[in-house]
Regions:
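Catalytic cores of DNA base-excision repair glycosylases
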Residues: 7-221, 225, 250-263, 272-279, ...
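Long, intrinsically disordered low-complexity tandem-repeat segments
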Residues: 225-258
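Short amphipathic alpha-helical interaction segments
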Residues: 302-316
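A short, conserved structural fragment
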Residues: 316-329
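Short, amphipathic alpha-helical interaction segments positioned at domain boundaries
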Residues: 335-339
Length: 339
């Protein structure tokens, strides 16, 4: 890999990296794994307080495995996508049973854990164990598509990394494993803070002079792709639109103001009135109760009976709620305390 990319990227990260607890020198592999699961589809600001509470209560896999799965759901609070809490609890029990209570360093062993895909396995192996792997989250994929391929990345968070993306990422990894791991988190941070989807700040980018996308004039994704905007007069995608800076090689300089122009806007998903909101309300009732709850407790927080039934059935099917023989409902593993 060219030092023209590695050196400025790593120097920028050393100056600008956010102070996050899972990046601290003493962070354990378990801490890194928990953070990666929590950060799936959830921003850092929401994760941070819940992560700190979780790690205070369950600093090791054994501590979590010793409690019922329902307690993991209760502690998960309002982070969303609560099946992640179930997967973390299941992972903890597997770590205790098969790995001596420790997170394995082997990539295949990590992939075999519940809810751990290629990205999360590579992230844990890299960030917790200093290994050399391509870590391809949304931010990294966007940065590398722009920087090395000169392309506006039009993928979405739910799209899987392609073979071409993986090969590109692997070709850019520094040879030394520890440096490669730091490179991976540096690229991720650059995508989160500077090379953002909708408002990239090219003037603050440490590798702007090497950026093929900037040199090409920041081309937009094709119409109809994820990130392309349908607004009349818009010139770019989510990820396009910040002005180039004078003196940056190849920049399409005067396209915007000094602070950058926001061109594409992400569509916000409707939440009010959805099944997801209903599920959240029902889980909130259970999380706030010390005993199992009656059906009437659910009726009190959601008026639409058909939707309530559908949401409750889904929670039961997902293993997030246990229906009890007496007609009440509880978080999984909870013991009825009273009638």
């Amino acid at each position: 890999m060219s030092t023209s990319l590695a050196e400025p990227m790593l120097a920028w990260y050393a100056r600008n990296a956010r102070d996050l607890p899972w990046r601290a020198p003493g962070a354990t592999p378990w801490a890194v794994l928990v953070s990666e699961i929590m950060l799936q589809q959830t921003p850092v600001a929401r994760v941070l307080p819940e992560y700190l509470s979780w790690m205070t209560r369950w600093p090791t896999p054994a501590a979590l495995a010793a409690e019922p799965a329902g307690e993991a759901i209760r502690q998960w609070g309002r982070l969303g996508y609560p099946r992640r809490a179930l997967r973390l609890h299941e992972t903890a029990t597997i770590l205790v049973a098969r790995h001596g209570g420790s997170v394995p360093a082997d990539l295949d062993a990590l992939r075999a854990l519940p809810g751990i895909g290629s990205y999360t396995a590579a992230a844990v192996a890299s960030f917790a164990f200093g290994q050399r792997h391509a870590v391809l989250d949304t931010n990294v994929r966007r940065v590398l598509a722009r920087l090395a391929a000169g392309q506006p990345w039009a993928g979405g968070a739910s799209s899987a990394a392609s073979v071409a993306e993986r090969r590109l990422a692997e070709s850019l990894l520094p040879a030394e494993p520890a440096v490669a791991a730091r490179w991976s988190v540096a690229v991720m941070e650059l995508g989160a803070l500077v090379c953002t989807a909708a408002s990239p700040r090219c003037g603050d980018c440490p590798v702007a002079r090497e950026c093929a996308w900037l040199a090409a004039g920041r081309p937009a994704p094709p119409a109809g792709t994820a990130g392309a905007t349908g607004a009349a007069g818009a010139t770019g995608a989510a990820g396009a639109g910040a002005a180039g800076t004078a003196g940056t090689a190849g920049a399409a300089g005067a396209a915007g103001a000094a602070g950058g122009v926001r061109v594409g806007r992400r569509r916000t998903q409707k939440y009010d009135g959805t099944d997801r909101q209903c599920r959240g309300r029902l889980l909130a009732v259970l999380r706030g109760a010390s005993d199992p709850v009656h059906r009437a407790d659910f009726d009190a927080v959601w008026a639409g009976q058909a939707q309530l039934e559908r949401a409750l059935d889904g929670l039961v099917a997902d293993g997030l709620v246990d229906p009890l023989p007496d007609g009440r409902f509880a978080l999984p593993g909870s013991q009825p305390l009273s009638r």
